[in-house]
């Protein structure tokens, strides 16, 4: 499991990336995390906002992977949707993208196609 701390709604929140993150995201969105992150990276590179609804689901999935139960997280999903600042959402999304790359051992600048089916993370 890879973890990073971010500030959301004025609170320190630990996000995690592991297989549980991918499973939770798929259950919420019915989309593979690989496909979502690929589109998010393309949007960021084109200076467009990624799909905000799926971005929030990715953050919730990442919080659930760390805290195991939504009620244990320092913020609730409703806080995230209603009170989080755009910069906080963006920072959290960049943290998730970074953790995913680290989990799959993808060097910076590596083509996205190599991430799917790559080496398993060091802590799975």
Regions found by a protein language model. Give the residues of each.
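Short linear motifs in exposed loops
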Residues: 16-17
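Helix-loop "lid/cap" segments that line or gate small-molecule binding pockets
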Residues: 60-66
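Conserved active-site "lid/cap" helical segment
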Residues: 46, 59-60
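Short Gly/aromatic-enriched secondary-structure transition segments
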Residues: 22-29
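Charged interaction scaffolds used for protein-protein
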Residues: 1-12, 31-50, 67-124
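Elongated alpha-helical scaffolds
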Residues: 54-58
């Amino acid at each position: 499991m890879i973890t990073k701390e971010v500030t959301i709604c004025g609170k320190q929140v630990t996000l995690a990336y592991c297989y549980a993150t991918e499973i939770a995201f798929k259950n919420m969105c019915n989309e593979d995390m690989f496909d979502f992150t690929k589109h998010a990276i393309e949007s960021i590179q084109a200076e467009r906002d990624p799909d905000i609804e799926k971005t929030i689901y990715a953050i919730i999935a990442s919080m659930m992977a760390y805290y195991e139960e939504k009620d244990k997280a320092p913020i609730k999903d409703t806080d995230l949707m209603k009170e989080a600042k755009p910069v906080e959402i963006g920072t959290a999304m960049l943290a998730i993208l970074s953790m995913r790359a680290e989990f799959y051992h993808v060097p910076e600048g590596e083509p996205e196609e190599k991430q799917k089916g790559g080496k398993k993370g060091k802590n799975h």
